[in-house]
Amino acid sequence: MTHALRTSPPQDVIEVNAYTRGVIGPTLTMLGPIRDGGRIVTGTPPGCWGPMITPIFRGGHEVTQPVAVEGAEVGDAVALKILRCDVASLATSSGVMEFVEGRYVGDPFVAKRCSACGTESPPSHVEGTGDEAVHCSVCGAEVNAFRFSHGYVIVLDRENRVSLTVDKEAAQRIAGMPGKMARLPQLSEQHSILSLARADLSGLAAHMQPFLGNIGTLPSVDMPDSHNAGDFGTFLIDAPHAFGLSKAALDANKTDGHMDTNSVREGAIVICPVKVPGAGVYMGDMHAQQGNGEIAGHATDVAGEVELQVEVIKGLALDGPILLQRPDDLPPMARPMNAAQRAHVKRLAERYGQGEIEENGPITFIGSGPTLNDATKNGLQRAADVTGLPYDEILNRATIAGSIEISRLPGVVRVTFLCPMPILERLGIAHLVRAQYGLDGEAN
């Protein structure tokens, strides 16, 4: 496979304003390279519903053009420090989906087709508002492969971090000015989901806590961006379209960037596998808010503004992401103890003659698979493989000094536990863990 990697002097800051049409992988041309320690700044288009109703897209998201990282080689890892993650949209729409039969081949996220003229992934345009607003530009027929079974329009107060679903009348007004309200980046190619004006749920106030649903490094084979995970990726296995893969190929090539993990937000650090030369850092699918599980299948996809800092971790071979969550996002059992608690532990050790008190720090492994049970086993096995700790010891650590948390149904989880500091040192990430959790001084 030829990797589309540019050769030019490393840059301190790269601004990205170009996007994919739903496909990520080694054939994409990368920007950069960015120097090790440099920053990537971008505006991200919404994921999911906008790309879903735009037939030219071959995946469920519209992520940024990938950026090569100086010195990142296959078998390394790249730490992405999320410095800023802000919502740009003033409104969005989302809800529970259903498919329109006859308008896709195997997978409506990947292989859309006009049922009237037979054109695959046709160009399209929006006429009016409502469920039938998207039309094929080849023959003029209505072409949207998706419908809401229950949907809503939600307006966003970005400064005060609150939001509110609106009634049909307000949704129709918003649908008349989708550009002003969605605030898509200039080069985004998706239709705004606001044009559908679906308003089955009104008057519900919700907190805002933005995060990135899809962030990481390129898989080593081209695939739909939304399917770069062990759950949605299963729909690629023996699929009847151009992106069909075997299970072995999926497992070997994906990087699990599509996590929908609500703690992947400003202040978090995502440590990603490098499976192509230069890594190819990409991001998108910002959500304004989401509870654990994303049980509706889709959350509040918004345009956003993101700033990252990159750091290469040499020789850290990963199968999927490691997450260093913000201290306030850690599960309670995995939070480092404060000075008073450590003093109590020291006295407890003295009382029972325990000579050693382990120095450790929190770490989270992302696991993915067709089901939550599969994802949990995957996350636990990744933790054992990377740390060298016995699998059963990981079970015990995650039970009494950690947690298993659902990120997304049907199959993405967080496996968090306190890991011995010498192991974190060996992995080359102890400095990140110490800085993230204040472990060089008194923990808060």
Question: Model-found features: residue ranges?
Answer:
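N-terminal, charged/glycine-rich beta-strand/loop interface patches
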Residues: 2-262, 273, 277, 337, ...
